[in-house]
Amino acid sequence: MQIKDLIYKVSLISVSGRTDVDVTAICFDSRKVEKGSMFIAVRGVSSDGHSFIADVIQKGATAVVCEELPEIESTADCTIIQVKDSAEALGMIASNFYDSPSSKLKLVGVTGTNGKTTTVTLLYRLFRKLGYKTGLLSTVENIIEDKVVQATHTTPDAISLNKLLADMVKAGCTHCFMEVSSHAAVQRRIAGLQFAGGLFSNITHDHLDYHKTFDEYIKAKKLFFDGLPNDSFALINSDDKRGRVMIQNTRAKTYTYSLLALADFKGKLISTTMQGLEMDVDGIQAWFRLIGNFNAYNLLAVYATAVLLGEDKEEVLMQLSTIEAANGRFEQQISATRITVIVDYAHTPDALKNVLETITELKGANKIITVVGCGGNRDAAKRPVMADIACQFSDHVVLTSDNPRNEEPQAILTEMEKGVRIVDKKKVLSVLDRKEAIKVACTLASTGDIILVAGKGHETYQEIKGVKYPFDDRLIIKELLDTLGK
């Protein structure tokens, strides 16, 4: 593909050099540049691609895309393209390089603090059951029809993302459902993608380590809807007071869903048990295998999205009633002595509260024992809040490590302990080692009790000082219950 084809629709400031030259590869990592490559100089969190322009020209790059022109004597035969926003240009160029794969799919993006993974996973499974070849891009995994590609971020970088979408098109997929994180919107990783629709679930306290203020976080989520085309749909949870903010400037056709008020798609939770929930959806009663009020919202969002994509209401509900939750989302193990252990990815205050409220409604006279930690190098303000919420709903709380990353685990625990009120101190233990913490919870539990192990969900590792060690809450729980004879 030639340079002129790659910069189609890119907002250009200047072009110095030929544009009728072939490009064999595109990259934003200077280490991957080879002769014939186009290098896009992107400003990252820890490094600036502009610092490596001289290096990539020496390596034989055919073209360089940048915001600031390089201060070097000679650019050889390299075409220099100046743009206003190189991160946005990267998205557009990646889309052009892979022949605009998103335009050949019905691509739906899901954003919000909680529920993204469950929602996209349910949509993926639903559309498979409806007979479509479907792709999935999620925190847990990326799937091309039925081929799993492991995920490393909620939203991959623009080049990886377009390659995945191109592979989906090649595999015959007609639909793709993807999580869209606030980071991805701000970093322009979704620039150049053509969405058939966007879905907003809710917004609560998260990622303030990156966005700094809650207003900035809201604006980051809103960016996604601002960029939707006029032939797409924007579906919002109208029970979240910030839902309307998301669609203030969107060109998309807007729709709402709600459990509490009038909306385009209306649901009402009838009952919920540890086996599932019954809900009225647009006047039709149906039973689902998911649990809790928060999942009623996820199910309603999935139903509404499917209908907006042209599917039959009754067929959607019938197929949706057969689908189970995503891995690590309210995932249950029941021991020989009838102790229920729930593993959930809840790693924000709101998500933890939702899960514990659901367990409280269903527990009867039995105890709730919560094991919870907070990740390192992430929003520290939520740490005492998470501990406080765990105490409010639990009979025993074991504070522990999550993914400490590059922070000291004890320092994170100390910050969590600040959220424990004097009246709750007797019910709280701090156990630094996560496996030991789960063991303590299992030891405290008796027949009928419920243990919640929160924070990591589907993850199969624990990240400490830059190293990911094998660690799966679900396997640890099974091992400990068997060892303890519980």
Swiss-Prot record:
Report if keyword Thylakoid is assigned. Answer: no
The chemistry this enzyme catalyses reads: UDP-N-acetyl-alpha-D-muramoyl-L-alanyl-D-glutamate + meso-2,6-diaminopimelate + ATP = UDP-N-acetyl-alpha-D-muramoyl-L-alanyl-gamma-D-glutamyl-meso-2,6-diaminopimelate + ADP + phosphate + H(+)
Q: In which pathway does it act?
A: Cell wall biogenesis; peptidoglycan biosynthesis
Which cofactor does the UniProt annotation name? Mg(2+)
User: Where along the chain is UDP-N-acetyl-alpha-D-muramoyl-L-alanyl-D-glutamate bound?
Assistant: 30, 154-155, 181, 187, 189
PTM-bearing positions, type N6-carboxylysine: 221
What is the similarity comment for this entry? Belongs to the MurCDEF family. MurE subfamily.
- Tell me, what does this protein do in biology? Catalyzes the addition of meso-diaminopimelic acid to the nucleotide precursor UDP-N-acetylmuramoyl-L-alanyl-D-glutamate (UMAG) in the biosynthesis of bacterial cell-wall peptidoglycan.
Q: What protein does this entry describe?
A: UDP-N-acetylmuramoyl-L-alanyl-D-glutamate--2,6-diaminopimelate ligase
Q: Which organism is it from?
A: Cytophaga hutchinsonii (strain ATCC 33406 / DSM 1761 / CIP 103989 / NBRC 15051 / NCIMB 9469 / D465)
The top of its lineage is: Bacteria, Pseudomonadati, Bacteroidota, Cytophagia, Cytophagales
Q: Which gene encodes it?
A: murE
